[in-house]
Amino acid sequence: LKNKIINEKYEITREEAIFLSQIPNNDMETLNILFDAADQIREAFCGKYFDLCTIINAKSGKCSENCKYCAQSAHFKTGADVYGLVSKELALCEAKRNENEGAHRFSLVTSGRGLNGNEKELDKLVEIYKYIGEHTGKLELCASHGICTKEALQKLADAGVLTYHHNLESSRRFYPNVCTSHTYDDRINTIKNAKAVGLDVCSGGIFGLGETIEDRIDMALDLRALEICSVPINVLTPIPGTPFENNVPVEPLEILKTISIYRFIMPETYLRYGGGRIKLGEHVKTGLRCGINSALTGN
C-alpha cells in the first residue's frame, strides 16, 4: 500500500484502512512497520517542513451549542471564563508575540454557533484581522468562528484571512452522540462555503468522544473528499461538568495507529498535533514518525 501511494498516488479504500486498524495495539513489531511506512509517505509528499500555528480564545463562554465535550457551552456548568470579543490591540499583541516565537499562522477563535445574523461581531472581526495584517510581517491569518455563510466568509477573506478552521469532530454516524443543536451537514456546508470563496480549510476532530476507530476512519475519508489541507488531531481532555467528563481515554498506541492510517488516507495533508496531545505521554514524540508534520503551539 505504501509503495502504491508513493509511486501511483493511490487512494486507499475504507476496507484497506480498516484492515490497517486491525493491527493489535500490543503488536509493537507490526505497529512500528506501520509507523515507518506512514513516515515514508509523509517524507515523499511533504518533505521535512514542519508547520506551526497558534490561536487565541478571542471570545469565551455562553455558547448556545450543546457539544458534549466543550467547556464553553452554556448548557453545562464548567466554570469556563466568560468574556466578549477582545480588542484589536490585544489581538495584535498576541499575534506579534506568537510571530516572534516562530508561529507561521495565527487564528482568532470565538465561542458561539457562528457569525450568521451577527453582523456587528463580523464587522469587528474584519476590523481586527485587517489591523493584524497591517502590523505583522509574514504571519498568515486563520479564523475559527463556527457556522458561516459564503457572504460572511467572503468578508473574512477580504480582510486578509487565508484559512478557515471548522472541525467535523467525528464521523457522520457518531456525530449525533456529540451534538444535537446543529448537524454534521451544517459543518460540511460551512466547509464548502469557505472553499467556495477561495479559503483554505483546516478541519479535523477529537479522539476519545466514545467513537470507534471505524468512525475515525470515516471522518478521515470525508476530510479527504473535502480536500482539506490541514487536519488537526485533538485528544479529548475531559472537562468536569460536561457529559463527557468520565469518558474512557483512548490508548496512546491506538491514537498513533490512527494517525498513521490518516497519513495513508491523506498523504499530502498537514496532519497537525492539536489539543490534548499531552495525553500521549511518553509516546508524543513517536507521533512525529507516524505522519505528524505540523502542530498547534502555545498553552
Show which residues each predicted segment covers.
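Flexible, acidic/Gly-rich N-terminal and inter-domain linker regions that tether
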Residues: 1-65
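Core AdoMet radical
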Residues: 58, 75-93, 98-191, 200-204, ...
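Auxiliary Fe-S-binding modules of radical SAM enzymes
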Residues: 1-29, 224-299
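Short functional micro-motifs and their immediate structural scaffolds
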Residues: 68, 72-75
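Conserved, mostly hydrophobic/aromatic
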Residues: 38, 67, 166, 194, ...
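Catalytic cores of alpha/beta
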Residues: 148-158, 209-222, 278-290
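Active-site phosphate/pyrophosphate- and oxyanion-stabilizing loops and adjacent acidic/basic residues
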Residues: 39-40, 130, 260, 285
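Conserved strand-turn element in the central/C-terminal portion of the radical SAM core barrel
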Residues: 106, 113-116, 190-214, 233-248, ...
